[in-house]
């Protein structure tokens, strides 16, 4: 009974502590448990004594486990602080909700860092092996969806480091030797961006191939070329499609340039000034396939130029996609109807049964503004930051990660749309016969006859005005009608008029000449098949 009374006193003491700490959700749950315990303890039976002893031991175990867990999740910078971080601050400052996507690169960088530490005798080989094994196990767990990322640990770096320490003990605490989260996050971002440039290049290549395939299949199809959305000159549909292939080629070139500038390792810069420990940044750079090491430690941790440059590349890509989408949205219209997009890539209306909407194209066009916004966000984010690292930089990942995901999705889905779109060649040809689209060919005919171009331009303008008045095309005007405006016009004028003759007579390099377009298709087929 004495033991029982003593135990009961201890139990009530624990209850009191739990109620005082009731603001904590875990302690609050315990309070409910102890309310039940109080009731049991008021019953003077031997069963109550047994229940009391069991629950006392159980609660003490929980207290021990929770205390140990709290110690493991202690902030890495907690030594300077006398109070725990407010829950609101943890929620506001965490980045794990978005930077978890960098886990593979964080682990890759940590393995390289561990290898370097062992090479420089800053840790033992046994410690290195334990680190590498533990990091690979964590990577496997994340891939399998079994790893729990915790907001209380702020970011991807501390989540992985904490998990490593939990696995291998004190050896894990040595991983951060000669490293700061400042150079660590810069490394992660560089590794991620480096991979992204290569993935995006491949995706663009796939889109180019679809466009070239369509160009080859529709070689000979004539369509109106537009300026100011007005009929201008006839062109080949293939020539039009290859224009976007050229745009995407420049996008790929920009990505390659971006790769060259970002492919430097920041490891070794630490917080901003380097380290007094003897390390080997060249080793980690080579291990991670970088071309070299950042030459200035302050620049290494504060540089986000590569993020801005990549965001600019993404913006250019999105802009090119949006231009194509804008045109094809117009071409889907029943008044134009140059193309038919597969039902699988369109949607309908909730109220109008007949509707078939090009929503995919519209969304790509709409998402382009979002990508532009991320580029602007990065520029504004960095414009006022003093050297070196500032917490503002945490927001760079929000912008660049979303911009990349958006453009990757847009490029991929547009490749599918292109592959599943049909062209109405007859409607395109019919539209090409409107709007005096062969007028420039007539002006150049006069130039060949010795008429100065400005005079030829005026003569043809007068002829067009006359044709509008009498409701006829240029090719339908009688020879006498032409001669009324210029005596140099002969019967051979009809060899340059009409859209087919216009297309046949193009000669300049890079023009819509059928022979040149065919050669360009062959060029792109070979180039894209090489990768």
Predicted regions and their residues:
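Short, well-ordered beta-strand elements within core beta-sheets of diverse protein domains
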Residues: 113-123, 239, 246, 308-316, ...
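Short, low-complexity, charge-dense intrinsically disordered segments
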Residues: 1-21, 31-39, 43-71, 428
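Generic, well-ordered alpha-helical scaffold segments in large soluble proteins
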Residues: 113, 134, 138-141, 163, ...
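A helix-coil-helix interface module used to build multimeric assemblies
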Residues: 72-274, 279-285, 292, 344-349, ...
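Amphipathic alpha-helix face/heptad-repeat signature
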Residues: 103-106, 127, 131, 196, ...
């Amino acid at each position: 009974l004495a033991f029982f009374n003593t135990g009961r006193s201890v139990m009530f003491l624990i209850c009191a502590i739990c109620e005082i700490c009731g603001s904590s959700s875990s302690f609050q749950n315990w309070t409910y448990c102890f309310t039940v315990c109080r009731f049991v303890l008021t019953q003077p039976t031997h069963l109550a004594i047994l229940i009391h002893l069991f629950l006392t031991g159980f609660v003490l175990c929980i207290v021990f486990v929770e205390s140990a867990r709290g110690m493991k999740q202690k902030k890495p910078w907690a030594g300077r602080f006398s109070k725990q971080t407010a829950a609101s601050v943890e929620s506001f400052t965490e980045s794990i909700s978005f930077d978890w996507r960098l886990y593979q690169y964080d682990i890759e960088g940590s393995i390289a860092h561990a290898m370097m530490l062992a090479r420089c005798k800053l840790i033992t080989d046994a410690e290195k092996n334990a680190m590498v094994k533990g990091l690979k196990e964590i990577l496997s767990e994340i891939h399998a969806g079994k790893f729990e990322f915790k907001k209380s640990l702020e970011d991807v770096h501390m989540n992985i480091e904490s998990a490593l320490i939990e696995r291998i003990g004190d050896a894990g605490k040595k991983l951060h030797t000669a490293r700061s989260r400042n150079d660590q996050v810069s490394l992660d971002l560089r590794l991620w961006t480096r991979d992204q440039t290569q993935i995006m290049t491949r995706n663009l290549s796939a889109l180019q191939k679809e466009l070239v395939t369509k160009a080859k299949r529709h070689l000979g199809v004539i369509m109106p070329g537009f300026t100011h959305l007005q009929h201008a000159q006839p062109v080949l549909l293939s020539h039009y499609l290859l224009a976007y292939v050229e745009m995407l080629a420049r996008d790929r070139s920009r990505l390659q340039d971006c790769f060259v500038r970002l492919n430097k390792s920041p490891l070794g810069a630490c917080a901003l000034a380097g380290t007094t420990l003897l390390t080997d940044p060249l080793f980690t750079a080579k291990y991670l396939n970088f071309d070299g090491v950042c030459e200035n430690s302050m620049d290494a941790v504060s540089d986000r130029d590569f993020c801005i440059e990549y965001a600019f590349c993404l913006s250019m890509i999105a802009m090119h996609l949006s231009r194509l989408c804008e045109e094809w949205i117009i071409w889907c219209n029943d008044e134009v109807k140059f193309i038919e997009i597969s039902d699988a890539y369109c949607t309908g209306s909730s109220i109008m049964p007949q509707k078939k909407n090009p929503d995919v194209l519209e969304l790509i066009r709409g998402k382009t503004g979002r990508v532009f916004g991320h580029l602007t966000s990065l520029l504004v984010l960095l414009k006022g930051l003093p050297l070196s690292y500032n917490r503002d930089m945490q927001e760079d990942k929000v912008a660049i990660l979303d911009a990349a995901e958006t453009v990757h999705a847009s490029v991929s889905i547009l490749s599918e749309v292109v592959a599943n779109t049909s062209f109405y060649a007859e409607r395109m040809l019919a539209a090409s016969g409107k709007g005096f689209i062969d007028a420039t060919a007539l002006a150049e005919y006069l130039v060949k006859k010795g008429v100065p171009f400005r005079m030829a331009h005026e003569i043809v303008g007068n002829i067009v005005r006359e044709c509008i008045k009498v409701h006829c095309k240029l090719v339908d005007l009688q020879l006498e009608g032409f001669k009324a405006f210029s005596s140099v016009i002969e019967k051979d004028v009809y060899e340059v008029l009409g859209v087919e003759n216009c297309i046949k007579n193009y000669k300049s390099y890079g023009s819509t000449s059928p022979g040149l377009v065919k050669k360009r298709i062959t060029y792109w087929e070979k180039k894209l098949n090489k990768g």
